[in-house]
Design a protein with these regions (language model features):
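Function-determining surface determinants
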Residues: 1-389
Length: 389
């Protein structure tokens, strides 16, 4: 089955208010104790796969999870192992009759003979209830607890919105209502990813790089644009999560900047490919990207002018300015306004209701190319040598 959910982090000052909104009297509370398994080389996590056994109340459930087509979608296979006095042994034979689960494990493990060993555990108290919104059932789960290894632990306090029935569009609209009320910020990192980092004594996963996109000849222009933006969000959001959590490295900031540049170009060049594209999106993304450019300019001055001048006051001021720019950027990427932008683009990229177009993809591609060439030629023609003096 495919699980559709969004996860958000909650500012400490808004946690009690969110718990009240969930209303514990109307909610269920369950203790979830999970054990996560992988090989010594982390072959499963390298392929975006998680394998766990979790005690849910009195029953043990073995779950296989894998990345899906977007940050909302995940493959999930659950198997009820029953009520047991002790934690059960890991059992891979339960996947023998599920072709998709078998393929996921085969792709990750290949021919490895490495045994699957316990890597980390989670101990979570979940307060949850199903809320109806626009004829859609959404399970809201507040998870509070910790992830731990034999030598380290980390607190967890997050909220998940899972689609139980209805439309993805309603799930996204519902999520944004909670984002506005409780200043939630989108976090595409899973508990498995956080646990693996803790087990490896690392703060953050490597920065996500862009993947090459190929237009699909069999699909219309409006669908191709949705697919392109979906892929660019796959590039952007993991890097944004690292910045939001204040654990990012230089590469995360650079890759987020590249992803925003790609999104800005896509929304500017191909806006006529889909009637649902808003003119404001490119402007919003462009303004957002300027904050990354500002940090880049400061860092460039530090490594060039600052290094050359060797002035202690200049060096100190540049260091302070860069630190301030990074703090401002971390606040900006998790701001309600920008989380709204992410959700708006996600909503657009996942919409499946395409309007019939009177022209095929080739016509749109040729038309866009001709228009861009004309703009470039007009710009070159109007340029005078004095413009560069």
């Amino acid at each position: 089955m495919v699980e559709v959910e969004l996860k958000f982090q909650i500012p400490e000052a808004r946690r009690n208010a969110l718990l009240k909104a969930l209303d514990p009297k109307k909610s269920k509370i369950i203790q979830l104790k999970a054990k996560y398994y992988d090989t010594e080389q982390r072959l499963l996590s390298q392929h975006g796969v998680a394998l766990r056994q979790r005690l849910e109340g009195t029953r043990w459930i073995q779950t296989l999870k894998a990345a899906g087509k977007s940050h909302l979608h995940r493959f999930e296979h659950n198997y009820d192992l029953g009520e047991l006095e002790q934690a059960p042994q890991l059992d891979l034979s339960i996947y023998e009759h599920d072709a998709e689960a078998q393929q996921i494990l085969k792709n990750a493990l290949q021919n490895s003979q490495e045994p699957l060993k316990l890597q980390f555990e989670t101990d979570i108290q979940r307060t949850f209830r199903v809320i109806q919104f626009q004829e859609t059932d959404i399970e809201v789960s507040l998870d509070v607890g910790e992830v731990r290894t034999g030598t380290a632990q980390r607190e967890m306090h997050e909220v998940e919105f899972e689609l139980k029935s209805g439309s993805v569009q309603s799930l996204l609209a519902f999520s944004f209502e909670w984002v506005k009320k409780y200043q939630l910020w989108l976090d595409v990192r899973s508990k498995a990813e956080i646990g693996n980092l803790l087990a490896m004594t690392q703060k953050v996963s490597p920065a996500k790089s862009a993947k090459e996109f190929t237009l699909s000849k069999k699909d219309p222009a409006n669908k191709n644009l949705r697919l392109l933006i979906a892929q660019q969000l796959q590039h952007l959001l993991p890097n944004i999560a690292a910045i939001s959590a204040v654990v990012s490295e230089k590469e995360h900031i650079q890759q987020a900047q590249i992803a925003l540049d790609h999104l800005n170009l896509t929304l500017s060049l191909f806006k006529d490919w889909n009637e649902s594209v808003s003119d404001k999106w490119a402007m919003q993304i462009g303004a957002f990207k300027q904050q990354f450019d500002h940090l880049q300019h400061l860092e460039h001055m530090q490594t060039t002018l600052g290094a050359f001048l060797q002035n202690p006051n200049t060096a100190s001021n540049l260091t302070k300015d860069i630190l301030y720019a990074k703090e401002k950027l971390a606040n900006l990427v998790r701001s309600t306004q920008n989380v709204h932008h992410y959700l708006e683009l996600l909503m657009f990229s996942l919409d499946t209701e395409e309007q019939a177009q009177s022209h095929d993809l080739k016509w749109f591609a040729q038309n866009t190319l001709q228009n861009q060439y004309k703009q470039l030629q007009d710009s070159l023609t109007s340029a005078e040598i004095t413009d560069f003096e």
